[in-house]
Amino acid sequence: MQIAWLNDQQPLLSVFVADGAGSVSQGGEGAMLAVNEAMAYMSQKVQGGELGLNDVLATNMVLTIRQRLFAEAEAKELAVRDFACTFLGLISSPDGTLIMQIGDGGVVVDLGHGLQLPLTPMAGEYANMTHFITDEDAVSRLETFTSTGRAHKVAAFTDGIQRLALNMLDNSPHVPFF
């Protein structure tokens, strides 16, 4: 989580979560690199004063993270799949909120009307499968949600607590958890 101040002194909250695939050798490192790259990308955007909370920002962030993961894989002479991880993010200011997601896990938010889960956790073709930011089709699988309201409460989580945090019948927040 990072809190920054925009040029007009308005607060900006950035929350990013990534979860390395358990079936690959560098999943944890991939997750760490993804979150660090997302934070660096946001810092650059805030300093440059060019911040639009929209699909373009989400897509460009994902492309930047992918470049970093591909570079790390090449440097270590590994396949990029070895760095597979999910990626979730929320960026919120008084002017709006952007949520993005590739993979399972979730971002629960209160935009002033109670808790909601704007994006459904992704599932793969088979049980216990999901999608990763390193997948060939990651950019096309990227899901986003935008709102003109600021986030009053935020919780981002991986699949490790997904079944505790959500009512799995309707993919809604399990309010007592929060």
Question: For each predicted feature, which ranges?
Answer:
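PP2C/PPM-type serine/threonine phosphatase catalytic domain
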Residues: 1-178
